[in-house]
Swiss-Prot record:
<dbReference type="InterPro" id="IPR028082">
    <property type="entry name" value="Peripla_BP_I"/>
</dbReference>
<keyword id="KW-0238">DNA-binding</keyword>
<protein>
    <recommendedName>
        <fullName>Uncharacterized HTH-type transcriptional regulator in aml 5'region</fullName>
    </recommendedName>
</protein>
<dbReference type="GO" id="GO:0003700">
    <property type="term" value="F:DNA-binding transcription factor activity"/>
</dbReference>
<dbReference type="InterPro" id="IPR046335">
    <property type="entry name" value="LacI/GalR-like_sensor"/>
</dbReference>
<keyword id="KW-0805">Transcription regulation</keyword>
<keyword id="KW-0804">Transcription</keyword>
<comment type="function">
    <text>Putative sugar-binding regulatory protein for the alpha-amylase gene.</text>
</comment>
<dbReference type="GO" id="GO:0000976">
    <property type="term" value="F:transcription cis-regulatory region binding"/>
</dbReference>
<dbReference type="Pfam" id="PF13377">
    <property type="entry name" value="Peripla_BP_3"/>
</dbReference>
């Protein structure tokens, strides 16, 4: 049977795969901004409470995945 493959992190090396790999892309810029902000607060001597950040990943569909034949696709939001 057919197999769909999904990666994680959207590495720049994915551009060299065949077929192009579908992936889950993390919001690296937002994650880095939050981490650096907390670090700078600590360095400045401000008390930093433990905080849980939730970041929204993005599914990037490329050539390594396909809709199963004969099924209706379901979009998750």
């Amino acid at each position: 049977g057919d197999v769909s493959v999904v990666g994680f992190d959207d590495s720049p090396l994915i551009a060299f795969t065949s077929p192009p790999l579908s992936t889950v892309r993390q919001p690296v810029q937002a994650m880095a901004t939050a981490a650096v902000g907390a670090l700078l607060e600590e360095i400045e001597g401000n008390p930093v409470q433990r905080t849980e950040f939730v970041f929204q990943p993005e599914l990037v569909v490329r050539g390594s995945t396909a809709q199963p034949p004969g099924r209706v696709s379901q979009v998750l939001s």
